[in-house]
């Protein structure tokens, strides 16, 4: 089948995307939904289950936005208008209507990158610039890393001279240049200005980082970077017969992540007596009701999976550069005077929470190099706090939560906080928390990807023992992670690896999300 361009897909499916009376789909989502429609249509053309007469009859009275009485030949205008063309021959258009109704409501469209797959497997490629002549050497460090600064001596003095790495108990010599790798910012070069011994107890990375920062604050160590002398550069060019003076080199590598489609499936069985009585007493069709139940449950479960993966992979917030000294990492406690900065009343303590959210958003930008956090997933109580506080630079007012929707029977989208954060309610949160995340203007610019393959496949049969009707639904999709999500990994891993989240590549490592638990509300 010929691969259609984005414009061709939008033009083909425009009547269904923009059909009168259908829920509106934002312009930014239409190209993605059109691709999902195209994948669904491709499945119609090859799978026999869509031609099952009983399923077709059930669907004929099920969907109002794509109600059918016949085969529309996949004409998007007819599907959207509910026009019939004779006897029911297949249920493709009705399933398309279900997809049209359900898929755009997935929370994944707002907090994940959505990348429809053309086949059961997908690939994500990442180009990485690397220090050294062998890009795939073990431990080769990545350049242009948003979290770690450049090796500022690599093309300069560091090409001709190697500098000693600082360690516990070292005695500094005036004028000597040393090197150190900070856990949160990368390699630096430091020149000693006086004789001093490094603390002997600084025997792990965190303690050594703290000791060196202490000496920098005291002026004992000063950060420095220099180019090489002209005479050294000439020698490295092979000038005057010089040898064994190689240039420092850089290269690049292209890594691949593989994403595989997985499935969700549900079935329902009912008795003939139930179907007869339901039709006679209530005027309802058992197939139609169960179809709605199964399809809705699958979509709700995918929504939950997306939220769970984000929280699973989110870094521990209120840690590192976002931790207020003296407070507890990972937890914002309204009963802790350090967290609420000595607030006198509730409105002031609520504003302290806003500032913590801002700190987490800025940390996401520092680690990813893509942008500040721009959405929040939070428990009901936390959303109530955010809705009750004055977000302006003013006295800390506290009032009724009138600015946000906090009723999840209406929507899980609460509103926009301070003109910068889209806030979503986690209606099933087990304890109070908030997660700050980032999703950019295009679908590749996200920490996690939702990759639908075949949105919905209906199935029907009968139990061979009692002849009772059985119906089911399947959906196939993949979940992938951004190859640059683990910001702390400056040395790239293997060139071909799984792109699906797991305990090894995701747990607490995704720099696009930061989660903080909230206590004492």
Swiss-Prot record:
TM helices/strands, residue ranges = none
The protein's superkingdom reads Viruses
InterPro entries for the chain: CAPSID_Myoviridae, Gp23/Gp24_T4-like
Q: Name one GO cellular component term.
A: viral capsid
* Cystines in this chain: none
- For whether the record's keyword set contains Iron, the answer is no
What does its PTM field state? Answer: A proteolytic cleavage by the prohead core protein protease gives rise to the mature major capsid protein during virus maturation.
Site residues (Cleavage), renumbered to this chain = 65-66
Q: Which Pfam families match?
A: Gp23
* Assembly behavior: Homohexamer. Interacts with the portal protein. Interacts with the capsid vertex protein that forms pentamers. Interacts with hoc; one hoc molecule associates with each capsid hexamer. Interacts with soc; this interaction reinforces the capsid structure. A total of 960 subunits of the major capsid protein forms the 160 hexamers.
- What role does this protein play? Major capsid protein that self-associates to form hexamers, building most of the capsid in association with pentons made of the capsid vertex protein and one dodecamer of the portal protein. The major capsid protein self-associates to form 160 hexamers, building most of the T=13 laevo capsid. Folding of major capsid protein requires the assistance of two chaperones, the host chaperone groL acting with the phage encoded gp23-specific chaperone, gp31. The capsid also contains two nonessential outer capsid proteins, Hoc and Soc, which decorate the capsid surface.
The family assignment reads: Belongs to the T4 phage capsid protein family.
How is this protein named in the record? Answer: Major capsid protein
Q: Which organism is it from?
A: Escherichia phage AR1
Name of encoding gene: 23
């Amino acid at each position: 089948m010929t691969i259609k361009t984005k414009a061709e897909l939008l033009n083909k499916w425009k009547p269904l995307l923009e059909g009168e009376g259908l829920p509106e789909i934002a312009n930014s989502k239409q190209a993605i939904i059109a691709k999902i429609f195209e994948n669904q249509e491709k499945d119609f053309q090859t799978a026999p289950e869509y031609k099952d007469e009983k399923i077709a009859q059930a669907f004929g009275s099920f969907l109002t936005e794509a109600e059918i009485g016949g085969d529309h030949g996949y004409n998007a205008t007819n599907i959207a208008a509910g026009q019939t063309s004779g006897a029911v021959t297949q249920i493709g258009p009705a399933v398309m209507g279900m997809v049209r109704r359900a898929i755009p409501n997935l929370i994944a469209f707002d907090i994940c990158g959505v990348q429809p797959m053309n086949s059961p497997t997908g690939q994500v490629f990442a180009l990485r610039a690397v220090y050294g002549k062998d890009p795939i050497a073990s431990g080769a460090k990545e350049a242009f890393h948003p979290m770690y600064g450049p090796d500022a001596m690599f093309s300069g003095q560091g090409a001709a001279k190697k500098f000693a790495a600082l360690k516990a108990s070292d005695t500094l010599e005036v004028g000597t240049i040393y090197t150190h790798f900070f856990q949160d910012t990368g390699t630096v070069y430091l020149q000693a200005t006086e004789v001093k011994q490094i603390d002997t107890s600084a025997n792990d990375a965190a303690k050594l980082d703290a000791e060196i920062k202490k000496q920098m604050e005291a002026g004992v160590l000063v950060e420095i970077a220099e180019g090489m002398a002209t005479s050294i550069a000439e020698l490295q060019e092979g000038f005057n017969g010089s040898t064994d003076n190689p240039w420092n080199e850089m290269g690049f590598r292209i890594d691949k992540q593989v994403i595989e489609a997985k499935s969700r499936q549900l079935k329902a069985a009912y008795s003939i007596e139930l179907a007869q009585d339901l039709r006679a007493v209530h005027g309802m069709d058992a197939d139609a009701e169960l179809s709605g139940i199964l399809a809705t449950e699958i979509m709700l479960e995918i929504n939950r999976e997306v939220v769970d993966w984000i929280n699973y992979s989110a870094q521990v917030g209120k840690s590192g550069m976002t931790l207020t000294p003296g407070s507890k990492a990972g937890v914002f406690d309204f009963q802790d005077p350090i967290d609420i900065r000595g607030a006198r009343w509730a409105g002031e303590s609520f504003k302290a929470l806003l500032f913590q959210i801002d700190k987490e958003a800025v940390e996401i930008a520092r680690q990813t190099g893509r942008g500040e956090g721009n959405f929040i997933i939070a428990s009901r109580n936390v959303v109530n706090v955010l809705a009750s506080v004055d977000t302006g630079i003013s006295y800390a007012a506290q009032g009724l939560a009138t600015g946000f929707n906090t009723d999840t029977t209406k929507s899980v989208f609460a509103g926009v906080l301070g003109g910068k954060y889209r806030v979503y309610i986690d209606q099933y949160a087990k304890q109070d928390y908030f997660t700050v995340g980032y999703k950019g203007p295009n679908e590749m610019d996200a920490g996690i990807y939702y990759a639908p393959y075949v949105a919905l496949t209906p199935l029907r049969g009968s139990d061979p023992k009692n002849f009772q009707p059985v119906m089911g639904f399947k959906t196939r999709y993949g979940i992938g992670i951004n190859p640059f999500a683990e910001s702390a990994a400056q040395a790239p891993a293997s060139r071909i690896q799984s792109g699906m989240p797991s305990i090894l590549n995701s747990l607490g490592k995704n720099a696009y999300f930061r989660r903080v638990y909230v206590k004492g509300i």
